[in-house]
Amino acid sequence: MNKHLLLLIISFFSLPDRAFGYEIVVLKSSTSTINQQIQNIFTDELDKRIPHRGLKSIQPHQVTEVVITKGDEGGCTRRIQSIHPDLILALGGQALKVALLVPDIPVVHLLVIHPETSIDKKRPVTGVSLSVPPKVQLDEMTRYFPEVTRIGLVYDPKRSSKIVAQLDSVRPDLEFIALATENIAEVPELIHSLRGRVDLLWMLPDLTTTNHITIQSYAIFSIKNKIPLLTFSQKLLKHGATIAVTFDTDEMARQAAGLAMDILSHRVGTELTALVDPPVTTIINHTMTANLGISIADRRTADE
């Protein structure tokens, strides 16, 4: 009896088509709604990507949630090490920093601003960027407002010079009037100086020129001059923006699951792309387009 049982166990674990799940730690600094939503979608997508072939003897992935306690980052790293995960999903900048304190474990990150400052090149570390490339934003804008050819923007050279430097090359068919300042107080007047010179005003994700003090100036200019206002955040549509081209968090979670499977299945190593562009969603504020008397070329997007 024992001999037969032993043979059965050996045969079971030697099946070439058996698919084992992975041990994954989801590391985050809070249990916010967005973190939980991303975690759920990531886990569901990962389960869908388990190889299904042969006898399909499937062991599901084991996902352990670790929430960072302020001041106890060392305790978090020790707990993760005790789990011996195959991969860490880090949600947010603090989570990425803590994840990189755990040696040798591959990391996939989401919701991290400027992650390139934290990347460890000695192991697989990758993630989805929070920055939508300028060309993607401009191409989406053109899809809805094809008659726009002159675009105005105000920017801080210390924060956004890299974005501005590439505009002429990514969209040579457009004219850009880019006004530089490092002083928040100058932003309203610079916006006003664009009157009659542009067909669209563009808000950059620049803390000097786009903030709670300057938002009203953008909206007033758009309304007075009957031109659309392009922004990077859905929330700013409620403050008078006309179109938002922003990252899609649900699709980012699915994209992260794909990156994780690439690492776990050894399809990539330390040479993998450190940062990939995010999937985007475009939202039109149809109330504002009506108020501005502007027609749009693509009406598939729902009202905001």
Feature roles, as predicted:
Residues 1-4:
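Positively charged n-region of N-terminal signal peptides that target proteins for export
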Residues 7-14:
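Bacterial N-terminal signal peptides
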Residues 19-304:
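Short hydrophobic alpha-helices and adjacent helix-cap/hinge residues
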